[in-house]
Amino acid sequence: MASQNPNKKKVLFVTSEIADLVKTGGLGDVSAALPRAMAHLHDVRVLIPGYPQVMNSENPIHIIGELGGHAALPPCKIGRMDMPDGLVIYVLICPELYARDGGPYGANNGRDWPDNHIRFARLGLAAADIAANLAQIHWCPDLVHAHDWPAGLAPAYMHWRGQRTPTLFTIHNLAYQGVTSLGSCPELGIPAHALQQEGMEFYGKMSFLKAGMAYSSHITTVSATYAQEITTPDFGCGLDGFLAAKTQQGLLSGIPNGIDESWDAATDPHLFAPFAIGDWEGKAINAAHVRELFGLKDSEGPLFAVVSRLVYQKGLDLTEAVSEYIVQNGGQIAIIGRGEPEEEQAMRELALRFPGQIGVRIGFNETDARRMFAGSDFLLMPSRYEPCGLSQMYAQRFGSLPVARNTGGLADTIENGVTGFLFNESTADSYREALSRAFKVFAFPELLNAMRCRAMAAPFNWCKAVEPYAELYEKLVAKALGKTHHK
């Protein structure tokens, strides 16, 4: 994937997940797709911890470097994994931190690992070490692009050391802040001057997310609307003033995510039947199979899908509140996802209330998700906030019209009344009004199919995101070198 083109910048992606190997949400999708989409412009390589899912993958790992310890952060090795398509992944090998059953952030019981501050400080320090050429891996980045709180200390360590390599920090979800006690400072080798309001201090504790924002050269988030929302108290999660100041300084911008080309109903091998724009027979076949999969009765009414993490942010309580309205009007709901135990139980109870009309599968696999997008008529996304969201783009690509709250990336990627249905207030009444519009459209097949056609044709590929990222990379590198950037 890398090229000898001297104009290409070398960029190190620092992330806690990548969809090829380990994924809990949209961060994993972006970490897999954006470096590949960027390949023709820059040499982007990915740094990720050596979780079991990474170490046990079918792709061989070759040890190429070693890094010493720092404070309580243990020494580690750097492995190189070459993906079949050429993407280079650097693996941070440290069994005492990462060789554990469970997910990237916690055990199978859902509890976070108590030493996450050590685990992800080690990731941030490794990125800083690679940027300083301490790993001696014969590749040194021109820019480090860190993602979300687990990578937040990468720009911080680089700043504290006086490293000149520019850094970009992307916020995928401001609510996850990587907060730990001030007493962790000595373990992490954090200088005392960092624990100030303009540094990583956060209401008497310290935040990895704030560190990434405070010490990076520039901050992005994953939609233009969300970039505006997080400067307000309603969405700022206690950081609105800090982010408003960054905006005023021209240091915060929104760049929307894209989706990869595999989301194509005409060619997707996971579907029960392929279909293209204007050909709805295949969609009907998928709908029948989805109903069977979820134990729903045969029906001529609309099929609504929920493909989501089952957490408070996603507004599942609102879907619960409008479920009777949907069923009474002839609709059915298929729900798939995993998340907080109380949300999972609420969805199970919802299915018991409406047997044959609402079906739930706790867990997640992408094959079922793709089939649900292909078979459903509408996707339900009543999120209280949504930094970008990918499901609404996947759904539109497969002809499923989103019924979604007018927030964040949903506002930027759904055209109300054209490719979906938006509602403003996080209330059941506002949600119900949008659903009534969806039911009315469903009653007129020509109108429904026209909206499906427009949704399936919406331009959600990564090309739209790559260009502003590439320009920002070039601008930050040029600034670090003391050059003037020209567009």
UniProtKB/Swiss-Prot annotation:
Highest taxon of source: Bacteria
GO biological process: glycogen biosynthetic process
GO molecular function terms noted in the UniProt entry: alpha-1,4-glucan glucosyltransferase (ADP-glucose donor) activity; alpha-1,4-glucan glucosyltransferase (UDP-glucose donor) activity
EC number: 2.4.1.21
Function of the molecule: Synthesizes alpha-1,4-glucan chains using ADP-glucose.
UniProt keyword annotations, A-Z: Glycogen biosynthesis, Glycosyltransferase, Transferase
Class in the EC hierarchy, top level: transferase
Binding site for ADP-alpha-D-glucose: K23
Biological or metabolic pathway of the protein: Glycan biosynthesis; glycogen biosynthesis
Protein name: Glycogen synthase
SUPFAM superfamilies: UDP-Glycosyltransferase/glycogen phosphorylase
Organism of provenance: Pseudomonas fluorescens (strain Pf0-1)
Catalysed conversion reaction: [(1->4)-alpha-D-glucosyl](n) + ADP-alpha-D-glucose = [(1->4)-alpha-D-glucosyl](n+1) + ADP + H(+)
InterPro entries cross-referenced by the UniProt entry: Glyco_trans_1 (IPR001296), GS/SS (IPR011835), Starch_synth_cat_dom (IPR013534)
Family: Belongs to the glycosyltransferase 1 family. Bacterial/plant glycogen synthase subfamily.
